């Protein structure tokens, strides 16, 4: 799965960003569970999910800071 550009993430609505953040957190939980039970074959999915989550959280915090100012 390709990583979205930051500009694509910035075009998402707040609700979409929150939904994607929740989904990625669930995915990371599932990946950790699969790794603990030795069912995970593609460990690179951790890195991809963490990077996507970081992008979304960054855009979310930028928006929160801009509305607070």
From Swiss-Prot:
One Gene Ontology term, aspect cellular component: cytosolic large ribosomal subunit
Keyword set includes Cytoplasm: no
InterPro entries in UniProt: Ribosomal_protein_uL29, Ribosomal_uL29, Ribosomal_uL29_sf
Gene Ontology BP, a term: translation
GO function term, MF aspect, one: structural constituent of ribosome
Pfam families, alphabetized: Ribosomal_L29 (PF00831)
Membership in a protein family: Belongs to the universal ribosomal protein uL29 family.
Family matches, as CDD domains: Ribosomal_L29_HIP (cd00427)
Keywords: Ribonucleoprotein, Ribosomal protein
Disulfide bond residue pairs: none
Cross-referenced SUPFAM superfamilies: Ribosomal protein L29 (L29p) (SSF46561)
Superkingdom, taxonomy of origin: Bacteria
Protein name: Large ribosomal subunit protein uL29
Lineage: Bacteria, Bacillati, Cyanobacteriota, Cyanophyceae, Synechococcales
PANTHER family associated with the record: 60S RIBOSOMAL PROTEIN L35/50S RIBOSOMAL PROTEIN L29, LARGE RIBOSOMAL SUBUNIT PROTEIN UL29C
